[in-house]
């Protein structure tokens, strides 16, 4: 165990054992599950954030080194120092909690497109939903469904946590943390640096809990993006009049016209033709 400047506890990966995962599984099951589109979700969720250092910052080929992968779940902050440790952490959680395609744990990341570029080198990604090249909104692997909380809130983490009344762990100053300092997985982190890491995942968790409760949502019903709220309200409003559905069916595109529009779009925007292959 290690402790932050404010004495918040962080569990190091090396402190974990099989008993911890069984206890975590029991605690999460006691909180219940939610169902959506033939999938079961644990009602509680996890948050994750990574910290990296850049080697060769002033060269043509800088290299990013991950030295911290922190997660927060059910009041516990778990710190992995390498991706290999994180892969093993998720593997043990998946096995103990019987995670699968139809029994999922949600993990929110506040800049998922960035973390995704690292994750794809260590995990087999089974599902990806993106709005455009490198703009990942959601992905799935090993029973864990990762979602981008920035797309949900449309706010930076500092603004999101500071605007949440019940958030106790707001994001700390990036200038004070000194991103230019070179750190590796073997670097001994100071209590202040640990506080920065802790607040990022704990604060995000606290802010998301408040948002979901305020909006009367859970992980199964909350939209993926901030615009999802608007689309949902529109669908509900349109459903009030049965004639709207009939008019929609009457004016919808047929396969031939849809094909023509798709072809025209590819001609106008050739670089967006197959953006998924750029991951």
Residue ranges and their predicted role:
Residues 49-53, 111-113, 117, 150, ...:
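Anionic group-transfer/hydrolysis microenvironments
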Residues 47-49, 146, 279:
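Short hydrophobic beta-strand that contains or immediately precedes a catalytic carboxylate
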Residues 25, 29-35, 41-46, 50-113, ...:
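Conserved non-catalytic scaffold segment of RNase H-like nuclease domains
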Residues 5-14, 56, 183-279:
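Common nucleic-acid-contacting/processivity interface regions adjacent to the catalytic cores
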Residues 1-46, 50, 272:
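N-terminal accessory regions of nucleic-acid-interacting proteins
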Residues 56-61, 111, 116-123, 207-208, ...:
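A short acidic (Asp/Glu
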Residues 75-189, 195-199:
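Conserved DEDDh/DEDDy metal-dependent 3′-5′ exonuclease domain
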């Amino acid at each position: 165990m290690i402790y932050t400047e404010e004495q918040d506890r962080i569990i190091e990966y090396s402190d974990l054992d099989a008993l911890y995962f069984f206890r975590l599984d029991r605690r999460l099951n006691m909180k219940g599950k939610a169902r959506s589109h033939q999938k079961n979700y644990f009602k509680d969720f996890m948050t994750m954030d990574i910290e990296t250092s850049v080697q060769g910052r002033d060269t043509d080929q800088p290299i990013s080194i991950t030295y911290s992968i922190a997660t927060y779940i059910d009041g516990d902050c778990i710190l992995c120092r390498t991706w290999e440790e994180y892969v093993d952490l998720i593997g043990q959680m998946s096995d103990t909690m019987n995670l699968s395609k139809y029994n999922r744990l949600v993990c929110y990341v506040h800049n998922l497109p960035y973390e995704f570029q690292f994750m794809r080198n260590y995990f087999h990604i089974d599902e990806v939903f993106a709005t455009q090249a490198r703009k990942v909104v959601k992905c799935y692997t090993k029973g864990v469904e990762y979602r981008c909380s920035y797309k949900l809130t449309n706010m930076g983490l500092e603004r999101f946590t500071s605007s949440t009344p019940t958030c106790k762990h707001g994001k700390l100053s990036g200038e004070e943390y000194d991103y230019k300092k070179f750190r590796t997985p073997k670097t001994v982190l100071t209590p202040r640096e640990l506080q920065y890491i802790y607040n990022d995942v704990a604060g995000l968790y606290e802010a998301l809990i408040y948002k979901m409760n305020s909006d009367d949502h859970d992980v199964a019903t909350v939209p993926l993006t901030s615009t999802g709220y608007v689309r949902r309200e529109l669908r509900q409003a349109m459903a009030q009049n049965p004639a709207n559905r009939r008019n929609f069916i009457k004016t919808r595109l047929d396969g031939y016209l849809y094909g023509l529009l798709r072809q025209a779009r590819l001609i106008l925007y050739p670089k967006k033709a197959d953006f998924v292959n750029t991951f």
